Structure formats: C-alpha cells, structure tokens
C-alpha cells in the first residue's frame, strides 16, 4: 500500500531512540499517523514541527497498519508561529479540534481552511474570525452544524441577532426579543450579509457561540474538556484587539 499527499504537521511522539510517530492532517485522507524513521535527527526535527506544510509518502503492507511516512518540506512556517500568543495557542487548538474527527476520514475543506488560518495567525482580527469559522466547520462535519442563514421563527434573512441554544438556528431581532436573555448572540460578521468586520465584542460573542455548542454536543457527551489552548487563543485574540478585555464566560460556565 502506498499513497502521496499534501499534509500539515499536527504533532509528533517519540518512538524508540531515533524515530517518531508523526500526526498529520492530509488533504485527501484526513488526519493520519505514521512512523518517521530518524525523525529525531537534526535534519528532520525542524521539518516535523506543528504548522509546517509537507509532502508525505505513506507506505504499509496493509491499509490498517500504522505504516511509515517519508516526509519532504514544503512550507516551514513553524518558527514564525512561535512569535505571537495567538499563533502558539492557535496551532494547538486547531490540532485538538481535528482530533475530534475520526482518524483517516477525509475533510479537504478543513485542510484548506487550516492552511489559510496558519498563514494569518499573526493578525489577531483575521485569526479570530477564521478560527471561529473553523470551529463552525468542525461542528458541521461532526453532524452538529448551525443554521445561521434565516430566522427559525419567521424565515427572515435579515436582522438576524440571536441563535437559539436549543436548535442552533438563527433568530431575528424582533422574533427573539421576548427571549433575548435566553438566546446566544449572533455576531454580525457571521450573518448572511457577511459585510461586517469582527471587533472585540462580536468576536467574544462568536467564541461564546461556538464554545457553547462544542461543549453541549461534543465535549460533554464524550466526557472530555476543551483544551486549555482554546482559552489561551481566545484570550490572546481578544487582548490583541483590546488590551482591556477580560475573560468572558457564558452563563453555563463555558469560556467565551
């Protein structure tokens, strides 16, 4: 068995004295593990850093085997991903999100989105908005997609201001007004019009929105917690936009 694909390094684990088991996100074959011989060598260590884009060739006798990777560098961005808190936490948080998906399950759109985000992690405003959209895409691929295109009550596609915590569907300002204190806010930049830039308040609301549904549909049923890197990324992104911003929590205790 053999195949070749584009990949992004998510992490490595030591295996024996000189080798590592690399975890990568491939474009056509999803999240995949493989042994990299001499992966701890001086030549390979810089290549196998999280966030780097590589080309991998995977070989194994049978498809269900771990197999071995041959890895060639394409874009070595890991060094600059260590420059900002949003980048450091963002790489870790996105890796954790991808681990919620089944191994070897292809999600090419998530691979493409991951590459875009990695190239924008130095800009907190762009990185925050892209990260929220990445979380929405992961929720959708897990079967818990939100419907933000029209009002659940009236079918209206304008002035959407809330999201129902029960249905995950958008609600217009007028229809949701009587229950506004029980609704989640829908940030304008996530609306169908899509012509609003994310500011610190709308970004905080967006993090709270995705955090709520990840907790409800994924973390709580699986008995796991969101990785600390998500909170680190959220706070770094908000602080970069507004140094006076504080940690925000939803009423149920889920961090923004």
UniProtKB/Swiss-Prot annotation:
User: Superkingdom of the source?
Assistant: Bacteria
Q: Name one GO cellular component term.
A: bacterial nucleoid
- Gene Ontology process terms (BP): DNA recombination; double-strand break repair
| Keyword field contains DNA repair | yes
Read off the Pfam families from this record.
Answer: RecO_C, RecO_N
Which keywords annotate this record? Answer: DNA damage, DNA recombination, DNA repair
Against SUPFAM superfamilies, the record matches this protein to:
ArfGap/RecO-like zinc finger, Nucleic acid-binding proteins
- Please describe what this protein does: Involved in DNA repair and RecF pathway recombination.
Family membership, please give it: Belongs to the RecO family.
Record protein name field: DNA repair protein RecO
